[in-house]
């Protein structure tokens, strides 16, 4: 995209557009036979819960001391005013001794010296006393520590008596304990299915589908991505919801994107990941080392060591590399997302530490340590900061049990995250104080009731209106999505799973989707549709070949494309033929496209287009620099060639574009603010790496004089010296555009829908929407209006124009058939 268009795109866009039960267990070979790819891992360890015990006994005074140490008030034999139980002390191990000291001081009254405490050691048996345990620690489950206790440690202090500091210490013995759940991730089979020799028992990924006996409870049942509705995957029953809280601008921008996935299972009940939550998990399964790349979007890919490399399933192109020191010890991992050539680096524990773009721009991730202030995080290992290549930051804080509490964007604005008692995300409060709420396992929408937990059943938007609903069957498979008023309702029936499913749209039209299992992946092989408006039933078709690459695709009209060849080492298409008959015969419209590819990047270097006779019609050739940026692009057709030439800066941003003309100079030039620039205007870092000037072929210069902290332009000066000033709201929406003293204002509702545009002369247009976020009316300042009636599919079935006296002046009606195609329009 032209860099100038990139920086002013938001303004331009606004101006141009107004708006069940457990499955049968089978072995690994059966799993693969039935289309799954067995993925297993060790039990998951939950968060430690700490406790401190004083050797006192049951005394009211001791109960009062404990109550006060927790921040409560003792009244009428009860402790009141306590914080929620998940926030009770001790939140971390570091709070054990301070809590014991507080209890001691509250119990013994005023002290003139102390309290003082001796140290403690984990793993010591306590065999007597009021704080005794059943046995010495630690207690292990499958080799993982589940419980441990400390030796007695002593808290002492001198009491003040009669104004005199006591001669001897008063003492009290305490012990501490820590416990955590050790089990398979929620949703996995809890019986630890796989045991290999002396290797600790392993968990199996428990996808639960309502079919028997062909059920792979320990399979990562992978399927082709084909989403319907808002959205769900019809074959897997996966509900996936992407919510973008923050999006910066410029090269390799900061972004905070949350992803809900109903089949993410972790011990604390969370169902949301974010774009910085990818991780690597490594296990030695007997003699076969295996690593899992858990992606931010909810998918997990397994990589098996073949003696020299970690190799994924044949349909996965992304690369995983183990990093070691000179002695062969694991130091980290690198994951290459091949499509974008983005390189992710992980530490030895599998935490994501950096993300580097193809141009070499890096975002760095920082995590909490034992020395991190409690106001930021109470425990180590939590993401607290992401810093981009230019110094802009996202900062995060957490509550006492490790849940993300706030995010601060580069402008210093704060986003708040709220949770229910199951630690499920229930509310996000944005910088404009608007709330977006999430509902789970609601009656009538989750057939299994509270199981599986964490099923997203509804979203209430920032207008405080319920916008979306999702329904699940008794085993947690999503089968229906709809917007407010049953708009865009899509219902999936899994009765013939996994060979086919049926999908019913909001019009009641039923389509059947069929699937084929290949290399552990279910691939869509076709969709049928019913007859409509005199046209008979029809179906699409698809077939697949080596490495699950598509070999043929046919649309509803019988038009066919053959995929002739691939570079199978990289799964890159090298030849396809389009415009064939249903049987594969050539037609006058037939053409073949042949592609050659860059040796490193998934970028074409030569595209050749031929007609049905094999005659070359056009070629497009590209050369690239070492970062994959296009240096030259040449199009040759009819014996004529045109060439564009590009240059770039160190950030991969375009410096010059030299067009194809040779008779005149047609070079456009761009300059950028330095990576270390301290910028004029509202934000010191906002302009870094952003466009500073654009000079066209005639030498006319447009400059962007100011940027905000998000990288959005605030002041644009055109070649005539005329300045355009732009103002945004806290959600980065354009609210004002002043050009030479003439101001246009924009207003939005809570979800960001444009409500009103007021022009410099005071005239305006206002926009009205329904609860499903669809435009239903446009009104001008004189009172003229256009009203839209929409069906459940979003089609405008009626348009009515009213004048200032509310008199109907014109009506337009439309009728749509079963397949949602317009068949009738009337202008009475």
Where are these regions (language model features)?
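Bacterial N-terminal signal peptides
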Residues: 9-16
């Amino acid at each position: 995209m032209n860099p100038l268009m990139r920086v002013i795109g938001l303004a331009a866009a606004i101006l141009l557009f107004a708006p069940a039960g457990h499955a049968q267990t089978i072995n690994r070979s059966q799993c693969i036979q039935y289309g799954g790819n067995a993925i297993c891992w060790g039990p998951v360890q939950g968060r430690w819960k700490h406790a401190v015990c004083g050797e006192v006994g049951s005394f009211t005074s001791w109960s009062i001391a404990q109550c006060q140490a927790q921040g409560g008030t003792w009244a009428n034999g009860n402790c009141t005013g306590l914080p929620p139980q998940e926030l009770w002390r001790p939140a971390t191990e570091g709070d054990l001794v301070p809590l014991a000291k507080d209890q001691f001081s509250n119990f013994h009254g005023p002290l003139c010296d102390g309290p003082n405490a001796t140290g403690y050691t984990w793993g010591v048996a306590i065999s007597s006393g009021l704080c005794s345990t059943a046995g010495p620690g630690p207690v292990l489950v499958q080799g993982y520590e589940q419980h441990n206790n400390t030796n007695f440690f002593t808290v002492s202090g001198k009491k003040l008596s009669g104004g005199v500091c006591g001669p001897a210490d008063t003492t009290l013995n305490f012990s501490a304990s820590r416990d955590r759940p050790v089990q398979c991730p929620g949703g996995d089979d809890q019986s630890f299915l796989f045991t290999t020799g002396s290797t600790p028992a392993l968990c199996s990924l428990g996808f639960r589908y309502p079919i028997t006996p062909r059920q792979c409870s320990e399979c990562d049942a992978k399927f082709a991505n084909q989403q319907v509705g808002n959205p769900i995957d019809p074959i897997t029953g996966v509900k996936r919801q992407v919510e973008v809280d923050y999006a910066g601008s410029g090269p390799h921008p900061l972004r905070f994107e949350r992803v809900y996935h109903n089949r993410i299972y972790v011990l604390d009940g969370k169902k949301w990941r974010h774009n910085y939550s990818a991780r690597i998990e490594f296990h030695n399964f007997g003699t076969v080392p295996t690593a899992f790349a858990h992606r931010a979007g909810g998918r997990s890919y397994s990589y098996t060591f073949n003696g020299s490399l970690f190799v994924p399933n044949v349909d996965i192109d992304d690369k995983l590399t183990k990093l070691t020191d000179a002695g062969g010890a694991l130091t980290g991992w690198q994951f290459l997302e091949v499509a974008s050539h983005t390189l992710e680096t992980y530490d030895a524990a599998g935490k994501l530490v950096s993300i580097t773009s193809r141009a070499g721009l890096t975002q760095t991730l920082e995590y909490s340590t034992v020395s991190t202030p409690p106001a930021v995080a109470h425990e180590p290992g939590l993401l607290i900061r992401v810093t981009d290549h230019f110094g802009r930051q996202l900062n995060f804080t957490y509550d006492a049990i490790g849940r993300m509490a706030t995010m601060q964007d580069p402008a210093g604005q704060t986003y708040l995250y709220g949770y229910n008692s199951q630690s499920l995300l229930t509310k996000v409060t944005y910088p404009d104080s608007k709330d977006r709420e999430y509902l789970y396992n609601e009656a009538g929408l989750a057939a299994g009731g509270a199981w599986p937990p964490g099923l997203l059943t509804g979203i209430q938007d920032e207008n405080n209106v319920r916008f979306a609903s999702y329904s699940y069957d008794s085993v947690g498979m999503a089968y229906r999505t709809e917007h407010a008023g049953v708009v865009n309702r899509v219902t999936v029936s899994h009765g013939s799973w996994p060979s086919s499913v049926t999908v019913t749209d909001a019009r009641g039209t039923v389509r059947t989707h069929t699937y084929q299992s290949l290399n552990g992946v279910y691939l869509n092989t076709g969709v049928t549709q019913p007859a409509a408006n005199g046209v008979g039933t029809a179906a699409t078709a698809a077939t697949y070949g080596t490495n699950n690459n598509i070999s043929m695709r046919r649309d509803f009209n019988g038009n066919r494309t053959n995929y002739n060849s691939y570079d199978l080492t990289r799964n890159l298409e090298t030849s396809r033929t389009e415009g064939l008959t249903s049987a594969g015969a050539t037609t006058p419209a037939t053409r073949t496209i042949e592609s050659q590819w860059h040796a490193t990047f998934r970028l074409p270097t030569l595209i050749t287009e031929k007609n049905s006779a094999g005659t070359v019609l056009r070629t497009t050739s590209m050369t690239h620099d070492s970062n994959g940026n296009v240096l030259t692009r040449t199009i040759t057709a009819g014996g004529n060639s045109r060439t564009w030439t590009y240059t770039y800066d160190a950030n991969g941003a375009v410096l010059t574009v030299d067009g194809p003309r040779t008779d005149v100079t047609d070079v456009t030039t761009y300059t950028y603010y330095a990576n270390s620039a301290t910028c004029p205007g509202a934000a010191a870092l906002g302009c870094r790496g952003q466009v500073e000037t654009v000079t066209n072929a005639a030498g006319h210069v447009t400059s962007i004089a100011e940027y905000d902290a998000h990288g959005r332009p605030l002041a644009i000066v055109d070649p005539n010296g005329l300045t355009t000033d732009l103002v945004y709201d806290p959600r980065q929406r354009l609210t004002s555009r002043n050009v030479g003293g003439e101001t246009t204002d924009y207003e939005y509702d809570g979800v960001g829908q444009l409500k009103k545009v007021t022009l410099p002369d005071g005239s305006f247009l206002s926009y009205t929407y329904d609860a499903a976020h669809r435009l239903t009316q446009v009104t001008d300042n004189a009172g003229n209006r256009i009203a839209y009636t929409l069906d459940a599919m979003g089609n405008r079935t009626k348009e009515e124009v009213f004048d200032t006296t509310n008199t109907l002046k014109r009506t337009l009606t439309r009728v749509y058939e079963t397949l949602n195609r317009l068949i009738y329009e009337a202008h009475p």
